[in-house]
UniProtKB/Swiss-Prot annotation:
CDD domains the record matches: Riboflavin_synthase_like (cd00402)
Signal peptide residue numbers: none
Any Pfam family hit: Lum_binding
Upper classification of the organism: Bacteria, Pseudomonadati, Pseudomonadota, Gammaproteobacteria, Enterobacterales
Function text: Catalyzes the dismutation of two molecules of 6,7-dimethyl-8-ribityllumazine, resulting in the formation of riboflavin and 5-amino-6-(D-ribitylamino)uracil.
Name assigned to this protein: Riboflavin synthase
Keywords tagged on the record: Repeat, Riboflavin biosynthesis, Transferase
Annotated GO biological process: riboflavin biosynthetic process
UniProt EC number: 2.5.1.9
Lumazine-binding repeats (start-end): 1-97, 98-195
Binding site for 2,4-dihydroxypteridine 2: 48-50, 62-67, 101-103, 137
């Protein structure tokens, strides 16, 4: 599990491309190396990846076909930067919201509105069916960052970013058309799905022969 509080950004230093498979190497910040071992989990733009090799600050990770298809990690080139967070420990403060590191879809940066001390970014979700889980003032994970949803339309939503978030993460450098990874808040998803099932069951019961309104 992860907290959605990005611990740093890491530069992609090499890519070994194979059919439907990729190994990439990032240069992790020094403060994230303490106790790091092969097999550990590190989120890259919110996507949980497993450490396969450690060579100083250069840490290797394998990406499967499904990861490359669903997330924006397959778009990365050498020299790009990713948000990184090590897996949470039981004693860690949950400064954001609990996140699994399982990306559900991507979203495209559709509009950027900048003022002196904050920035509003609008996103268009690739899988529009997931919009029912994106609620005003609800949680959402964007490239591994725990954020609060601002306004919501049938096809888009926005978040408001303070200077600290813009400085510490890659969102401050995103341009129109850029793809970001999206993780829906699992509690929100569970509530929405449960309500839908209850309403569907009630409607089916009402439509049974002999059922009175």
């Amino acid at each position: 599990m992860f907290t959605g509080i990005v611990q740093g950004t890491a530069k992609l230093v090499s890519i070994d491309e194979k059919p439907n498979f990729r190994t990439h190497v990032v240069e992790l910040p020094d403060h994230m190396l303490d106790g790091l071992e092969t097999g550990a989990s590190v989120a890259h733009n919110g996507c949980c990846l497993t450490v396969t090799e450690i060579n100083g600050n250069h840490v290797s990770f394998d990406l499967m076909k499904e990861t490359l298809r669903i997330t924006n990690l397959g778009d990365l080139k050498v020299g790009d930067w990713v948000n990184v967070e090590r897996a949470a420990k039981f004693s860690d403060e949950i400064g954001g919201h609990l996140m699994s590191g399982h990306i559900m879809t991507t979203a495209e940066v559709a509009k950027i509105l900048t003022s002196e001390n904050n920035r509003q970014i609008w996103f268009k979700v690739q899988d529009s069916q997931l919009m029912k889980y994106i609620l005003y003032k609800g949680f959402i994970g964007i490239d591994g960052i725990s954020l609060t949803v601002g306004e919501v339309t049938p096809t888009r939503f926005c978040v408001h970013l303070i200077p600290e978030t813009l400085e510490r993460t890659t969102l401050g450098k995103k341009k129109l058309g850029a793809r970001v990874n999206i993780e829906i808040d699992p509690q929100t998803q569970a509530v929405v799905d449960t309500v839908e099932r209850v309403l569907a069951a009630r409607e089916n019961a009402m439509n049974q022969p002999g059922t009175e309104a």
